[in-house]
């Protein structure tokens, strides 16, 4: 969204928040939907290294469609409210995963729980659609072995 018009992107460039000594920057992984998990991990590591070294170019931070912000590395365990980076219309916040007792219908068993927070511009994304996206993401994360194939 640019304030007056909705711009539908035909690509999926995903930004991720990177904490540096100079402040927060958001490098962008281009065409993330066309890359394997390994390629995504390698590219994120390379961009994060450039960010830490202060060597990101302006083009490394342009064109994002969606941003992921993780405070888990800073020890934040509960959900937080990430702020959408305009002109994007959504951002996913990820907190620190912890093992918690979860009732499985018969007993409590230890389960890894990952708090997620999705913020989105309601002028563009209907609340129910946002909730369905988050539910889809949770199901994908619960079946990581399938995602990694």
List each language-model region with its residue ranges.
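C-terminal catalytic/motor cores of large multi-domain enzyme assemblies
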Residues: 1-149
């Amino acid at each position: 969204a640019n304030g007056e018009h909705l711009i539908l992107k035909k690509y999926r460039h995903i930004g991720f928040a990177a904490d540096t000594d100079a402040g927060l920057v958001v490098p962008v992984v281009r065409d993330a939907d066309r890359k394997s998990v390994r390629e995504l991990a390698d590219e994120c590591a390379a961009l994060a290294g450039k960010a830490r070294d202060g060597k990101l170019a302006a083009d490394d931070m342009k064109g994002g469609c969606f941003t992921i912000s993780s405070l888990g590395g800073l020890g934040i365990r509960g959900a937080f409210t990430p702020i959408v980076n305009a002109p994007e219309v959504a951002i996913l916040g990820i907190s620190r995963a912890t093992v918690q007792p979860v009732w499985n219908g018969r007993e409590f068993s230890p389960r890894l729980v990952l708090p997620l927070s999705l913020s989105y511009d309601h002028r563009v994304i209907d609340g129910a659609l946002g909730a369905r996206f988050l539910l889809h993401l949770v199901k994908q994360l619960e079946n990581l072995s399938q995602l990694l194939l």
